[in-house]
């Protein structure tokens, strides 16, 4: 990495702090507000300079698409698989379910992302998850009420906010036009929690 100016180092330090405390990079507006820049454009120019010097990678189209590069290693990352249609009873990451692989670093998300899922519809629009977005998912069965989860019912995969009351699961949309999905675990045997949402990549990022 080439040497940084004092201001560039200040921006880089902010990126690292924000990642450590929130699990995601700051937006340009957040950088500007924190460091007293007059506009988000000023933050963008500093980010471009950091990118040219090899300190970060900017992922186009994602408002938080900033990855801090580990300059101790030049290893390339493998990318994240995009999961398509899923057959009931098979692992979600089975080879036949993988439609593509995107060159996205899993460590850009906290906790680390394991796969991407394309979002269909607007049931989660009130939390900024929009039709066509790529949702980054961390595979886990250890989930809490209130988290946004990826759930599978038979061969249907859905993204909703979780609420569990005893043996009843409520999967809540973030759009008042959609009713909750109710699952009785004593009756529905083909139900799985596949993971939690850890980030999104806006739907025009890969055009």
UniProtKB/Swiss-Prot annotation:
The record marks 88-89 as: Cleavage. This is LexA repressor. Keywords: Autocatalytic cleavage, DNA damage, DNA repair, DNA replication, DNA-binding, Hydrolase, Repressor, SOS response, Transcription, Transcription regulation. Coiled coil: none annotated. It catalyses: Hydrolysis of Ala-|-Gly bond in repressor LexA. The active site is at residues 123, 160. Gene3D superfamilies: Umud Fragment, subunit A, Winged helix-like DNA-binding domain superfamily/Winged helix DNA-binding domain.
């Amino acid at each position: 990495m080439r040497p940084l100016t004092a201001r560039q180092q200040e921006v880089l330090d902010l990126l690292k702090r924000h990642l450590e405390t929130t699990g995601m990079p700051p937006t340009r507006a957040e950088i500007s507000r924190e460091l007293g820049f007059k506009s988000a454009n000023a933050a963008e120019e500093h980010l471009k300079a950091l990118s040219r010097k090899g300190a970060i990678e900017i992922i186009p189209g994602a408002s938080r698409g900033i990855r801090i590069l580990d300059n101790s290693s030049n290893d390339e990352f493998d990318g994240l698989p995009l999961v398509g249609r899923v057959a009931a009873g098979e692992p979600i990451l089975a080879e036949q379910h993988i439609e593509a692989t995107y060159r996205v670093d899993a460590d850009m998300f906290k906790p680390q992302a394991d796969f991407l899922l394309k979002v269909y519809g607007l049931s989660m629009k009130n939390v900024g998850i929009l039709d066509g977005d790529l949702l980054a998912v961390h595979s886990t069965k250890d989930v809490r009420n209130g988290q946004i989860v990826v759930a599978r019912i038979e061969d249907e995969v859905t993204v909703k906010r979780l609420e569990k009351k005893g043996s009843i699961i409520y999967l809540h949309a973030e759009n008042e036009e959609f009713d909750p999905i109710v699952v009785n675990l004593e009756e529905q045997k083909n139900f799985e929690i596949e993971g939690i949402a850890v980030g999104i990549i806006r739907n025009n990022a890969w055009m």
